[in-house]
Amino acid sequence: MSPTTAANQAKKLIKVPEMRRIKHIHFVGIGGAGMCGIAEVLANQGYKISGSDIKASKTTQQLEENGIKVYIGHEAENIKNANVLVVSTAIDPENPEVKAAIEQRIPIVRRAEMLGELMRYRHGIAVAGTHGKTTTTSLLTTMLAEENLDPTYVIGGLLNSTGVNAALGESRFIVAEADESDASFLYLQPMAAIVTNIDADHMDTYEGSFDKLKDTFVQFLHNLPFYGLAVVCGDDANIREILPRVGRPVITYGFNEDNDIRAIDVEQDGMRSHFTVLRKGREPLRLTINQPGLHNVLNALAAIGVATDEGVSDEAISRALKGFSGVGRRFQVQGEFELGEGNVKLVDDYGHHPKEVEATIKAARQSHPDRRLVMLFQPHRYSRTRDCFDDFIEVLSQVDQLLLLEVYPAGEKPIVGADSRTLARSIRLRGQVEPILIDPVEGNLQNIMQNVLQPNDLLLTQGAGNVGAISVELAQHHLYVK
């Protein structure tokens, strides 16, 4: 047996202790991106899993196909015989299942606390940051898999290569996204952590204080053991600011020369990016990632930092990047549709913060320099639209044609001056692009597509709300242009 094979086998076949007295776990809001993955992993560990959601979806259908009982609608009787309830921050305290659990003295835990339990007896790797978590988590998972380390993973989007966002592996490794939106990532105690960047988002959680947000990231990194590892983006000014307070082993990555891991000679080739990675004590390594944009090169560097430290070979890293098929709704090509003498290419992306939208626009420009860029954008949350209003005006003015959906509330009440009509008016006053408001309920989507789209356009559907479903609808109906 080779040393590599022996080492790999030593990292596998870990027996994970079960949670005492817990047999039946019920998830309130099981259809959520963060909830369904944990539910599936626990089901595969042998727990009885049930859950409820406000409406049926592809996710709830998939869960039922995998043997998980899903109730549509929230009722007290749904939690019968459950030993614990798992809830997300989106669940109202007045939810009948939550109230019933309180009355019956059934423990109620937050999603991240249950994720922390999954991580407790494994070698946990948590990926945090305002942007890029899902892609970075997926890249690292793919690298570990290429080294035959078979990790458990819980990701916030569908990994295109497997068609799922979570799976139970046989090794001691677990890779998971760490959610800062409600500060619940403080429940996690990983062995290694990535922080991709720190930006002002979800500020209601932090009482509007950016300093509190940064302090919370410091707390998160302090959850690492003193022998753990933090891999952080050294190009990010806010990360550099907190580094003196981290007090844990740190590796920095980025494009700047003072980083421990950096990318040089970056080239864009359509939907692919080529770069050379420099690491201390190693030969330069030329790599290709099957994704466009400098932000994805940074995501790759983060994953490379942890993978290298965990003993993943350069060959496995190279294979993982070259074969990476992406994550659902992350610059996902929906198809090309004939129009006149050319075609329109439809791409769907989940990014909803101004910096994410800007990175997507840059990737679109770099990968499709000869196409006119038409963006169908749906702002996500009134609070984010309010807090990032000026940034949205600047970023959305960078496209050639802007189509605006109304704000997706995500449970929030409307805020005066933070709606799409006001945003459109401000963008119009800037004078770079003429926004068009779309109301699918009124049925003007079809007419606007027919009047706006031109041969060889790139149509980018952008946002975290139901704009993804609208993108699917557009693809199914040939963009309404045929």
Swiss-Prot record:
UniProt pathway: Cell wall biogenesis; peptidoglycan biosynthesis
Keywords: ATP-binding, Cell cycle, Cell division, Cell shape, Cell wall biogenesis/degradation, Cytoplasm, Ligase, Nucleotide-binding, Peptidoglycan synthesis
Keyword set includes Transcription: no
Catalysed reactions listed for this entry: UDP-N-acetyl-alpha-D-muramate + L-alanine + ATP = UDP-N-acetyl-alpha-D-muramoyl-L-alanine + ADP + phosphate + H(+)
GO biological process: cell division; cell wall organization; peptidoglycan biosynthetic process; regulation of cell shape
Pfam families from the UniProt entry: Mur_ligase, Mur_ligase_C, Mur_ligase_M
Disulfide bonds: none
GO MF assignments: ATP binding; UDP-N-acetylmuramate-L-alanine ligase activity
GO CC aspect terms: cytoplasm
EC number: 6.3.2.8
Residues holding ATP: 129-135
Location(s) in or outside the cell: Cytoplasm
Family from the record: Belongs to the MurCDEF family.
NCBIfam families listed in its UniProt record: murC (TIGR01082)
Role of this protein: Cell wall formation.
Protein name: UDP-N-acetylmuramate--L-alanine ligase
Protein species of origin: Acinetobacter baumannii (strain AB307-0294)
